[in-house]
């Protein structure tokens, strides 16, 4: 095939005619590529890791966190590095944040970028189907179900049951020379959790077995996760298997009898999705165990601090007692028991609880994990790093709570600024049982302040951490009837 000279001439003429355009296009492409590379380099340089120390290899700063006063640990680093800093805790690189804006970002506005995370051993002990190990549709469904058990309409009928537990608890105190407040508050909070989980529909013998197995399980919660015969963790996991089997029997019995009412268990049994499918036995069991776990130690720790703060502030105790005596006189006059409505008319006592939650900050922080690289305030939070919103630092900031070390319930006469007060967390993973916790505190304080007096034994001050901050030795007290 031949190309005519005229055709060849036209082709090259056309090519040369387009040469300026091709050169321009080439230059534009090169410039764009160079600019893109420069932008990536600039972004990489700009988005540096937060300042901080990673501590010792593997151990990081874990020992310092769990042996020091957490306030001192957090404050030292915040003062040195600012509101966002890096560290290394429990074998994981972490970013700690201590401002309301950062906490809002992690827990609310960009919560989808941060998943809840727990040590694998904790997930095994509580159960992988428990709601606080999840996010997304499964978590949303479960949280809605659990919250429905702790709404005012569901809590109203429990007031009389909680009051009975309070009376039983307090009567056992007066028969002893002294008590360990924390231990007895754990028993009380645990009994309330069991009642909330099962209602009053189970045989006492069945509940006793469940209590025993759960207590055996709980003993190993903070142990080294070595699943070897003879270890505490192994014994706890064995109890976990037995507890699951016992719960399976209870679930099966309720299904067979068609009795799906009663406590959180009844709510979970009655749950159906759009295809009329219910929750599996393991999903129900894991969430029952999870709720009992979440409702026990933290509530008991706060109750212990309540008694400590009231004891240390006698004028405040007198004012609280006066408020409660007024309610008690009305109850006696009407010849009835304490009611839900009564607990809504305790403004001072409620503020004392709010201030205790702030001052004690039993939940010092929570764990999240970045599911992708996240930019915040000019820093890079790498994918896979743990992120810890520091509730304790926010609660003890003089910017949001003047004179933060002073115990002053009057500060709650005005609502705190958003995201400065988060004793139960915030966002989609906030504690669904917060109202139950406050209710059991109010009812116990009503009877304690109107029928008893207590004095702290010994003069040892300080805080012990294991894992929640509580007064040293669990606050030994002596209780006497009025």
Curated annotation (Swiss-Prot):
Query: What is its induction?
Result: By abscisic acid, dehydration and rehydration. Expression regulated by phytochrome B.
Membrane topology of the entry:
Single-pass membrane protein
Transmembrane intervals: 20-40
What InterPro entries does the annotation carry? Cyt_P450, Cyt_P450_CS, Cyt_P450_E_grp-I, Cyt_P450_sf
Question: Biological process GO annotation list?
Answer: abscisic acid catabolic process; abscisic acid metabolic process; release of seed from dormancy; response to red light; response to red or far red light
Reported consequences of knocking out the gene: Plants show a hyperdormancy phenotype.
Q: What is its main location?
A: membrane
> Where are the annotated coiled coils located?
none
Which compartments does it reside in?
Membrane
Any one cellular-component term (Gene Ontology): membrane
Q: Which PROSITE patterns match?
A: CYTOCHROME_P450
* Expression across tissues: Mainly expressed in dry seeds. Lower expression in rosette leaves, flowers, siliques and stems. Not expressed in roots. Expressed in both endosperm and vascular tissues of embryo during the seed development and in cortex and endodermis in germinating embryo.
Single GO MF descriptor: heme binding
* E.C. no: 1.14.14.137
Q: Which Pfam families match?
A: p450
Name any cofactors this protein relies on: heme
Query: What are the annotated disulfide bridges?
Result: none
Pathway(s) served:
Plant hormone degradation; abscisic acid degradation
> Which controlled-vocabulary keywords does the entry list?
Heme, Iron, Membrane, Metal-binding, Monooxygenase, Oxidoreductase, Stress response, Transmembrane, Transmembrane helix
Function (record text): Involved in the oxidative degradation of abscisic acid, but not in the isomerization of the produced 8'-hydroxyabscisic acid (8'-OH-ABA) to (-)-phaseic acid (PA). Involved in the control of seed dormancy and germination.
Stated family: Belongs to the cytochrome P450 family.
- What protein does this entry describe? Abscisic acid 8'-hydroxylase 2
The record lists the organism as Arabidopsis thaliana (Mouse-ear cress)
Gene that codes for this? Answer: CYP707A2
């Amino acid at each position: 095939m031949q190309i005519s000279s005229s055709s060849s001439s036209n082709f090259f003429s056309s090519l040369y005619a387009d040469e300026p355009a091709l050169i321009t296009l080439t230059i534009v492409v090169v410039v764009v590529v160079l600019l893109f590379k420069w932008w990536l380099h600039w972004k990489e340089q700009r988005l540096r890791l937060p300042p901080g120390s990673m501590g010792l290899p593997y151990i990081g700063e874990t020992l310092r966190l769990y042996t020091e006063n957490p306030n001192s640990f957090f404050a030292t680093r915040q003062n040195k590095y600012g509101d966002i800093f890096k560290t290394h805790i429990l074998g994981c690189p972490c970013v700690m944040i201590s401002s309301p804006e950062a906490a809002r970002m992690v827990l609310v506005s960009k919560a989808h970028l941060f998943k809840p995370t727990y040590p694998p051993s904790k997930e095994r002990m509580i159960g992988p189907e428990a709601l606080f190990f999840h996010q997304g549709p499964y978590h949303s469904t479960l949280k809605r179900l659990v919250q429905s058990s702790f709404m005012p309409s569901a809590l109203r009928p429990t007031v009389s049951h909680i009051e009975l537990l309070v009376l039983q608890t307090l009567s056992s105190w007066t028969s002893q020379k002294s008590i360990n407040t924390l231990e007895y508050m754990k028993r009380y909070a645990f009994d309330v959790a069991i009642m909330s989980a099962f209602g009053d529909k189970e045989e006492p013998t069945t509940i006793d077995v469940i209590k025993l197995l759960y207590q055996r399980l709980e003993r190993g919660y903070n142990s080294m996760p070595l699943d070897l015969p003879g270890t505490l963790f192994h014994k706890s996991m064995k109890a976990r298997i037995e507890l699951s089997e016992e719960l399976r029997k209870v679930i099966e019995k309720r299904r067979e009898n068609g009795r799906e009412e009663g406590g959180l268990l009844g709510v979970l049994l009655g749950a159906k999705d759009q295809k009329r499918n219910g929750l599996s036995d393991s999903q129900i069991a894991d969430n029952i165990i999870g709720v009992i776990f979440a409702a026990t130690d933290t509530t008991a720790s706060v109750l212990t601090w309540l008694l400590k703060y009231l004891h240390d502030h006698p004028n405040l105790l007198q004012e609280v007692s006066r408020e409660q005596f007024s309610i008690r006189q009305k109850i006696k006059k009407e010849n009835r028991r304490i009611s839900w409505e009564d607990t809504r008319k305790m403004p001072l006592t409620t503020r004392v609880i709010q201030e205790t939650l702030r001052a004690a900050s039993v939940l010092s922080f929570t764990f999240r994990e970045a599911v992708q690289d996240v930019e915040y305030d000019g820093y890079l939070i790498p994918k896979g790093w743990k992120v810890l919103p520091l509730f304790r630092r926010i609660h003890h900031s003089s910017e949001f709570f003047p004179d933060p070390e002073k115990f002053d319930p009057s500060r709650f006469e005005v609502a705190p600024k958003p995201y400065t007060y988060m004793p139960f967390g915030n966002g989609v993973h906030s504690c669904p049982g917060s109202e139950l916790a406050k209710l059991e505190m109010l009812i116990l304080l009503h009877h304690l302040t109107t029928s008893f007096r207590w004095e702290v034994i010994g003069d040892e001050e300080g805080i012990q951490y294991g894992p929640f901050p509580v007064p040293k030795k669990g606050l030994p007290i002596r209780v006497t009837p009025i």
